[in-house]
Amino acid sequence: MPELPEVEVTRLGLVDRIGGATVRALQLGKPLRWPIGVAPQQLAGQRIGELARRGKYIWMPLQDGSTPAGGLLWHLGMSGSLRFEAQLPPPGPHDHVELVTDRGSLRLTDPRRFGAVVWSPSLQAGCAARLLGGLGVEPLEDGFTASVLHQGLRGRRVAIKQALLAGDIVVGVGNIYCSEALFVAGIDPRLAAQRLSLARCERLVQAIRQVLRQALMAGGSTLRDFRDAHGMGGAFQLQAQVYDRADQPCRRCGALVRRIVQGQRATYFCPVCQRR
C-alpha cells in the first residue's frame, strides 16, 4: 500500500506541473471505492491550486475564477498510482480516472480498485472532514514529539507496531516503515505500546523521521505496483534493514531476521538488536 513517502513523492512530482492548470474534463471509468460526489462536467474550467498532503491523501484545491470551488481528495488505495503527462498512452484495464487539463492529463491507475477520488467543499467540511478528522499528527512536522507519542500510547495494550499502524496517533507510517523504524530505535515490535518510556518514545520519534526521510530520498518503495507521477518506481525497499529479509543475517549483528504476523500484517525484526 502506498504510504506517506509514496504519497508525498507523488505530490512533489505533481505540484509544479499541474498547479495552476485549468481542468478541461474529468473522465471516469469503472466505479471506485466511493462515488466522486460531483458531476464531472461541473469541474470544467476550474483552476487547480497548490497540492497538499494529509496523511495518505492528496488534496487538490480548485478555484472558479477567484472563488474557491472545493477540491478533489485523492487516495491511492492498496495499489494505486497517479501519473501526469502531456500525452498519456491509451487507458488500460486498470486505469479508472483521468483528469484532463490544458497542460496534460492526470491518470489514476489502480489494479485492486481500493483507490478513490472524491470532491469536497473544503478540507474542513464534507467528506474530507469525515475522512481526515480522526488522523494523528504528521510525523515530519514539529507537532510529532516524544511527549505526544508517549501520551497517545498510554493505556494501549496492543503491540507498539499495531498502535503505530492505527494512524490515530501519527499518520502515514505504514507496514514497511514501522518495521524499519522499530529496528532503528531498537524496539521489539511485540512490546505493549503502553510500556514505552518517554526516552524510548524519543528514540522512536527520531527513528520514524529518519526512515521516512530516507524513503523520500529513495522515491518511496515499490514492492509491486507503485509508480511516481513520472512513472518511475521507488527504491527504498532495496536498502531495508529488516523488511522482507526473513531468515537473512541482520545487517548490524548477523543474527537471522525473524518474520511474524501481527494484525494480519507481516512484521520483520532482529531478535538481538530489538529488545522488549
Curated annotation (Swiss-Prot):
Keywords noted in UniProt: DNA damage, DNA repair, DNA-binding, Glycosidase, Hydrolase, Lyase, Metal-binding, Multifunctional enzyme, Zinc, Zinc-finger
Annotated PROSITE patterns: FPG_CAT (PS51068), ZF_FPG_1 (PS01242), ZF_FPG_2 (PS51066)
SUPFAM superfamilies named in the record: Glucocorticoid receptor-like (DNA-binding domain), N-terminal domain of MutM-like DNA repair proteins, S13-like H2TH domain
Cofactor, free-text remark: Binds 1 zinc ion per subunit.
Assembly behavior: Monomer.
PANTHER family: FORMAMIDOPYRIMIDINE-DNA GLYCOSYLASE
One Pfam family named in its UniProt record: zf-FPG_IleRS
Primary role: Involved in base excision repair of DNA damaged by oxidation or by mutagenic agents. Acts as a DNA glycosylase that recognizes and removes damaged bases. Has a preference for oxidized purines, such as 7,8-dihydro-8-oxoguanine (8-oxoG). Has AP (apurinic/apyrimidinic) lyase activity and introduces nicks in the DNA strand. Cleaves the DNA backbone by beta-delta elimination to generate a single-strand break at the site of the removed base with both 3'- and 5'-phosphates.
GO molecular function: 8-oxo-7,8-dihydroguanine DNA N-glycosylase activity; class I DNA-(apurinic or apyrimidinic site) endonuclease activity; damaged DNA binding; zinc ion binding
Name of the coding gene: mutM
Zn finger residue spans: FPG-type: 241-275
Amino-acid positions noted as binding DNA in the UniProt annotation, renumbered to this chain: 94, 112, 156
The family this protein is said to belong to: Belongs to the FPG family.
Keyword Zinc in record: yes
Reactions that this protein is recorded to catalyse: Hydrolysis of DNA containing ring-opened 7-methylguanine residues, releasing 2,6-diamino-4-hydroxy-5-(N-methyl)formamidopyrimidine; 2'-deoxyribonucleotide-(2'-deoxyribose 5'-phosphate)-2'-deoxyribonucleotide-DNA = a 3'-end 2'-deoxyribonucleotide-(2,3-dehydro-2,3-deoxyribose 5'-phosphate)-DNA + a 5'-end 5'-phospho-2'-deoxyribonucleoside-DNA + H(+)
Protein name as it appears in the record: Formamidopyrimidine-DNA glycosylase
EC identifiers of the protein: 3.2.2.23, 4.2.99.18
List of catalytic residues: 2 (schiff-base intermediate with dna), 3 (proton donor), 56 (proton donor), 265 (proton donor)
